[in-house]
């Protein structure tokens, strides 16, 4: 459980809960290895043996405008990119290190064009920054470090100074929030103070100087949204690779949250990973999250040459096709009122401004759909994919018709589902 620590938070969060869908990008020199972004520690690779990826990183096909167009077409409203991951390699031109994209064969800052492309396509900009750094000479070796099992190395490096690394961390965050204009999201990753390997302990808020870090962040960019992973409570929580069973609560109160999910089984480019989620599954995850008051941050791991994998682009396009017709059942929507329970195999999303209820059909019902609590309150209903009317059904409580709640509205549903619609949605105009 996270410690009960908090500092200043953002004042403008409405855009985030309105957007509901964002792009996550995990990109770095691990894309050359093409077998997971944690490859350095999974395979216990030394800095020297990891160096060829740095020496050969030349993303000659990098077109961030195309990335931004793909995200926009998928219905996404913001994009978050890894400025530095746990291996310590920086995509931005940091003055505090030589371990950066400008010193690779690619020879340029890769973050600035990403920021410009996002803004050109109307996307808000987010920066992921790893609190961990396996390359930095002062980052203390612990149980996550690639050299964790190298006892002579651990003994030789026992004097590493966390204070020096902490100053580096703070300095890089200052650079990111100073040199690229308005930043909408700061996605810090991650704390693990509860871990204990016997010979070393995990790291958390005190190690990062998180309170001081976040005070600096608020001085530089008061309205940037910051996640919870520094162990200091901020603006939103980040369930990873799972869908919460209900709206997330902390200390008994609902909080803003965003589920981050991969397209396959890896965050970074993983050539041989075949665990691709179907567009239908991803759409259901998006809807499920919105029905519980949450966002979805959907990840793509670009190739070493700077492109989205064709399978990733096809998935984004399929999500975008659905969003083209159904965006208003997602954006600006949230959990429905508690007295309106969704039918079996359905999710409700609710727009509190328009008073419209959206019924997302995860399974196709036979002929009738019963909406408890809405008898006499349905002014009109229609399918969103084509705007066709869904008529109110008629039923009797006796004879061949089932007994239903007296306060239920009944919608007459076609026997066949619409062709080519991953998740059909009925828009219900509720009488106020």
Question: Which residue ranges define each predicted feature?
Answer:
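Mature catalytic domains of secreted/periplasmic carbohydrate-active enzymes
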Residues: 1-432
């Amino acid at each position: 459980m996270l410690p009960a620590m908090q500092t200043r938070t953002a004042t403008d969060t409405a855009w985030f809960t309105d957007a509901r869908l964002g792009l996550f990008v995990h990109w770095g020199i691990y894309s050359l290895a093409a077998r997971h972004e944690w490859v350095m520690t999974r395979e216990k690779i030394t800095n020297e043996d990891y160096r060829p990826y740095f020496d050969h990183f030349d993303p000659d096909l990098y077109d961030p405008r195309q990335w931004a167009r793909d995200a926009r077409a998928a219905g996404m409203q913001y994009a978050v990119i890894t400025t530095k991951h746990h291996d310590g390699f920086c995509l931005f031109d940091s003055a505090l290190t030589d371990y950066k994209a400008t010193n690779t064969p690619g020879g340029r800052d890769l973050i600035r064009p990403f920021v410009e492309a996002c803004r050109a396509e109307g996307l808000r900009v987010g920066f992921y920054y790893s609190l961990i750094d396996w390359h930095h000479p002062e980052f203390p070796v612990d149980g996550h470090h690639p050299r964790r099992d190298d006892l002579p190395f651990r003994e030789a490096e026992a004097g590493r100074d966390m204070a020096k690394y902490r100053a580096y961390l703070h300095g890089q965050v200052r650079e990111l929030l100073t040199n690229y204009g308005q930043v909408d999201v700061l996605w810090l990753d991650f704390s693990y103070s509860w871990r204990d390997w016997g010979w070393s302990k995990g790291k958390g808020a005190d190690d990062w100087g998180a309170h001081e870090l976040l005070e600096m962040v608020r001085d530089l960019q008061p309205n940037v949204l910051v996640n919870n992973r520094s162990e200091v409570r901020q603006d939103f929580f980040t369930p990873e690779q799972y869908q919460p069973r209900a709206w997330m609560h902390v200390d008994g109160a609902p909080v803003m949250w965003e589920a981050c999910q991969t397209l396959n089984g890896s965050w970074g480019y993983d050539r041989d990973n075949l665990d691709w989620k179907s567009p239908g599954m991803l759409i259901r995850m998006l809807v499920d999250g919105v029905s519980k008051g949450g966002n979805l941050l959907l990840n793509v791991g670009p190739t070493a040459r700077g492109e989205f994998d064709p399978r990733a682009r096809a998935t984004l396009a399929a999500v975008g096709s659905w969003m083209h017709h159904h965006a208003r059942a997602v954006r600006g929507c949230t959990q429905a009122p508690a007295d309106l329970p969704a039918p079996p195999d359905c999710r409700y999303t609710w727009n509190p401004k328009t008073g419209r209820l959206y019924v997302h059909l995860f399974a196709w019902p036979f002929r009738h759909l019963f909406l408890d609590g809405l008898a006499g309150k349905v002014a009109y209903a229609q399918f969103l994919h084509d705007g066709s009317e869904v008529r109110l059904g008629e039923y009797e409580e006796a004879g061949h018709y089932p007994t239903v709640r007296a306060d239920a509205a009944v919608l007459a549903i076609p026997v066949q589902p619409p062709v080519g619609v991953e998740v059909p949605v009925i828009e219900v105009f509720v009488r106020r």
